[in-house]
Amino acid sequence: VGDRIKWVVATHTHLDHSPAVAPIAKATGAQVVGMPPADKLFQDTTFQPNWAMQHDDVIVSDDFHLRAIHTPGHVSNHLCFLLEEEGVLLAGDHIMNGSTVVIVPPSGDMKAYIESLQLLETYPLLKIAPAHGELMGQPLETLRWLVEHRLAREAKVIDKLAVNSSVNLATLVTQVYDDVDVSLHDYAQLSLLAHLIKLEKELRAKSVGE
C-alpha cells in the first residue's frame, strides 16, 4: 500500500501515449497534467487535462519537484519533465534510445525540434528516461549528438538539392537516407519533409508543384 496517485502526466497526445490517462485518472482520482493537442492529426482528441501545463510550470510535492519543459518538435504540444532532485529527464518521444525520432509535419517541426534539443542542454541533467528504450546516461553528449546528426542530415539534403534542385520527395529520400533500410523510408520521408520545410522557411529551398 503506497500513497494515493495525485497526478497522471502526459508528455504529449499521440495515440500511443495519452489514451490511458483518462481511465487511470478515473480509477485513482488523480489530476491529469499535460498540454492539450493543438491539432487533430494522429492526436488523442479525448485528452482533457485538469492542468494545462506551460513551460517552467512545476509539480511540487513533499518528495519531489517535477518541472515541465516545453519541447516542441516531435509534436507541438510535447513536454519533457525534469525530476529536479534526481536530475532525470522524462523525455517522452523527444529522445529515444536506439532510434531517432520521426518528425511529422505540420505539427512536427524540425527547426523547433533542434532548438528544443539545444534548450535541454542548458538543464542539469544526469539521466534521460525515454518513453521508448532504456534509461540513458551521458545526457549532454546524447543531446549534442542528436543536434549534430540532424544538422548533418540537413547538410546532405542541401548537397543533393545542389545537384538536382527539382528532385521529388520519393527520389530525394533514397539519396539522403541511403544509409537507412528501405523498409523505413516511408518514415524517413516524413522527417525529410520536415527538413525541407525548415529550409524553405530559412529561404534555402523552395517547393515547386506538388
Predicted segments with their positions:
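C-terminal regulatory/interaction regions
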Residues: 159-210
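Metallo-beta-lactamase
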Residues: 65-156, 160
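Active-site HxH/HxHxD metal-binding segment of metal-dependent hydrolases
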Residues: 1-65
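Histidine-centered divalent metal-coordination motifs
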Residues: 11-17, 74, 132, 195
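Short, solvent-exposed loop/turn segments at secondary-structure boundaries
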Residues: 44-47, 102-105, 141-142, 184-186
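Aromatic/hydrophobic pocket-lining residues that form the small-molecule binding cavity
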Residues: 18, 113, 117, 192
